[in-house]
């Protein structure tokens, strides 16, 4: 490709509304342009990267035995009503009616459509297992689209759905998809972790997220510094302290704390170690509970894990924190003065809190706290559960090493759905025993557009994008200096351009009448891995300057050797 016949569209300045580096660089490198909130046009450079990501995904899905299909973006509402998600999904589901007043949705996902297809096409266990995939546009009416294509309303996604007659068969496909995803992200040169995850609104049993590690990530990823253990912070188990609870050394005393309504204020005003404090959070109780509220206690320096808490049988789902009015109606004290002593509602304490002694907590009287509280002496030990977020330095749940926490961008997610959708839509086949059998499902997604942004978040420097070779828009940039004034520069540039293309190498030759500084800046901004610079001065010695984008290293290579050198560097 020649720049004179190409839409380069690079920008010198960073657009003011671009918050994260991937959004900034995708705009500056001429990869995307915003059409409306959460909607982007992909320009040629961006589309080349997107297609490379898509091709890697397609190759590995085919290698794993999945079958490609294509389903409509527009879906009839009756399928969503049948599955029960018409009301559950909320405002992110874009609903509309056609000219016949029939309701439809723009598909944010395709569980209903594929299940409808399978229930009409399959009749016998002999046809299973099958795993269908597509690479298709999705639309989710995000309330706050942000970060460019990282969280856009319209996006490209690879979604796959497998169908089985047994859990064992589902597990085999799930493991195959796990391995395929690992190959996909490894081939793209990404630093990622496959982490245990909560199944969320999709439902089902087992679930893993594939997270690209990046500072701009929205998720906290927990992993061991020694083993392969990795989990989303919502799911990571906080191991109970291994040391026995220390013996009491203080008497419980009631202390006036009128200006200490938070743990931070209590610690500062009374010079308490924060790890000797306990915070009490009140949430709505489950419907069958005798009490309207439940008290959840975590150590002062720990955070409540809302996903873990919501799964407790005593707690209402979705997790709902009590208002001050609701708290005072039951406890007769405000949120800043709550604690376990004389608490009139059920109490659940974190494992770490159960191991504490001589600690401070609210007295359930406004403006007062108890100091020196000890379990079983001052208050009976309540129900104990893992209800906190892990912190860096906690022991790994698998017993190997300690935990590290980094930010991650979710680029893939695999689920064992079980029978959630097949039961709702009555998708069944005749089983081996001749009886009707509801199908067991798995689903497997990759955010193709998000992968592009995530790759940039891991691969950039002060000059622009530094693409991994496998997904770079071009493999080689040819920069002929003053080619319109130097015949030998032009002749050699054209010769190398033809020879490299004949070797199957993707080349962008900058044949614009631009200053060298502009040409260098654009190629580095775009992030092409290999650059060769052809100039009269080096040609006097039969040399060409070669530069590798990632390391920045430069070297002089003889003109007769440069093609072989590049072919070897790119193809190995």
Curated annotation (Swiss-Prot):
An annotated Gene Ontology molecular function: proline-tRNA ligase activity
Superkingdom of this protein's organism: Bacteria
SUPFAM superfamilies registered for this protein in UniProt: Class II aaRS ABD-related, Class II aaRS and biotin synthetases, YbaK/ProRS associated domain
Record-listed E.C. numbers: 6.1.1.15
GO biological process, one term: prolyl-tRNA aminoacylation
Keyword Ribosomal protein belongs to the record: no
Pfam families the record matches: HGTP_anticodon, tRNA-synt_2b, tRNA_edit
Catalytic activity: tRNA(Pro) + L-proline + ATP = L-prolyl-tRNA(Pro) + AMP + diphosphate
Localization: Cytoplasm
Keyword Nucleotide-binding assigned: yes
Entry-linked InterPro entries: aa-tRNA-synt_IIb, aa-tRNA-synth_II, aa-tRNA-synth_II/BPL/LPL, Anticodon-bd, Anticodon-bd_dom_sf, Pro-tRNA-ligase_IIa, Pro-tRNA-synth_IIa_bac-type, Pro-tRNA-Synthase_IIa_type1
Physiological role: Catalyzes the attachment of proline to tRNA(Pro) in a two-step reaction: proline is first activated by ATP to form Pro-AMP and then transferred to the acceptor end of tRNA(Pro). As ProRS can inadvertently accommodate and process non-cognate amino acids such as alanine and cysteine, to avoid such errors it has two additional distinct editing activities against alanine. One activity is designated as 'pretransfer' editing and involves the tRNA(Pro)-independent hydrolysis of activated Ala-AMP.
Record text about domains: Consists of three domains: the N-terminal catalytic domain, the editing domain and the C-terminal anticodon-binding domain.
Self-association state and partner proteins as the record states: Homodimer.
Similarity comment: Belongs to the class-II aminoacyl-tRNA synthetase family. ProS type 1 subfamily.
Name the record gives this protein: Proline--tRNA ligase
Species in which this protein is naturally found: Salmonella schwarzengrund (strain CVM19633)
């Amino acid at each position: 490709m020649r720049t004179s016949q190409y839409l380069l569209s690079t920008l010198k300045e960073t657009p003011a509304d671009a918050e994260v580096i991937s959004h900034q660089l995708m705009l500056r490198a001429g990869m995307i342009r915003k059409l409306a909130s959460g909607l982007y046009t992909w320009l040629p450079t961006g589309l080349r990267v997107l297609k490379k990501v898509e091709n890697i995904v397609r190759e590995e899905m085919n290698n794993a035995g999945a079958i490609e299909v294509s389903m409509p973006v527009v879906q009839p509402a009756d399928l969503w009503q049948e599955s029960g998600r018409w009301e559950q999904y909320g405002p992110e589901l874009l609903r509309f009616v056609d000219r016949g007043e029939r309701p439809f949705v723009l598909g944010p996902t395709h569980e209903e459509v594929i299940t409808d297809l399978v229930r009409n096409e399959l009749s016998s266990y002999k046809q299973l297992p099958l795993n269908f995939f597509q690479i298709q546009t999705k639309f989710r009416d995000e309330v706050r689209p942000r970060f460019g294509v990282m969280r856009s309303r319209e996006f490209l996604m690879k979604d796959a759905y497998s169908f089985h007659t047994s859990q064992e068969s589902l597990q085999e496909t799930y493991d195959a998809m796990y391995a395929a995803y690992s190959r996909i992200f490894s081939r793209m040169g990404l630093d990622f972790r496959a982490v245990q995850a909560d199944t969320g609104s999709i439902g089902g049993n087992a679930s893993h997220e594939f997270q690209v590690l990046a500072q701009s990530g929205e998720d906290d990823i927990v992993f061991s510094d020694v083993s392969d253990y990795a989990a989303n912070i919502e799911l990571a188990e906080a191991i109970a302290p291994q040391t026995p609870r220390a013996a009491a050394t203080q008497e419980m005393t009631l202390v006036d704390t009128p200006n200490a309504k938070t743990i931070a204020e209590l610690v500062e005003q009374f010079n308490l170690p924060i790890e000797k404090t306990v915070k009490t959070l009140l949430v709505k109780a489950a419907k069958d509970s005798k009490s309207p509220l439940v008290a959840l206690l975590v150590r002062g320096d720990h955070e409540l894990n809302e996903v873990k808490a919501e799964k407790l049988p005593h707690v209402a789902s979705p997790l709902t924190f009590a208002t001050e009015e609701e708290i005072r109606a039951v406890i007769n004290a405000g949120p800043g003065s709550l604690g376990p002593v004389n608490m009139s509602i059920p109490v659940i304490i974190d494992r770490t809190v159960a191991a504490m002694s001589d600690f401070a907590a609210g007295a359930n009287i406004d403006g007062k706290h108890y100091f020196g509280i000890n379990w079983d002496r001052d208050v009976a030990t309540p129900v104990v559960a893992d209800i906190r977020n892990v912190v860096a330095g906690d022991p790994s749940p698998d017993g190997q090493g300690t935990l590290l926490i980094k930010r991650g961008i979710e680029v893939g997610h695999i689920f064992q759905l079980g029978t959630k959708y097949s039961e709702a839509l009555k998708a069944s086949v005749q089983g081996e025993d001749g009886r009707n059998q509801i199908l067991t499902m798995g689903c497997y997604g990759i955010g193709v557009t998000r992968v592009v942004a995530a790759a940039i978040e891991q691969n950039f420097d002060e000059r622009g994008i530094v693409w991994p070779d496998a997904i770079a828009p071009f493999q080689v940039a040819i920069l002929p200096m003053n080619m319109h004034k130097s015949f030998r520069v032009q002749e050699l540039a054209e010769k190398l351009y033809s020879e490299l293309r004949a070797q199957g190498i993707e080349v962008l030759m900058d044949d614009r009448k631009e200053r060298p500084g502009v040409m260098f800046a654009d190629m580095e901004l775009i992030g092409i891995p290999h650059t060769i610079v052809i100039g009269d001065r080096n040609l006097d010695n039969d040399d060409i300057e070669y530069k590798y984008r990632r390391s920045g290293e430069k070297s002089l290579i003889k003109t007769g050797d440069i093609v072989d050198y590049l072919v070897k560097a790119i193809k190995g």
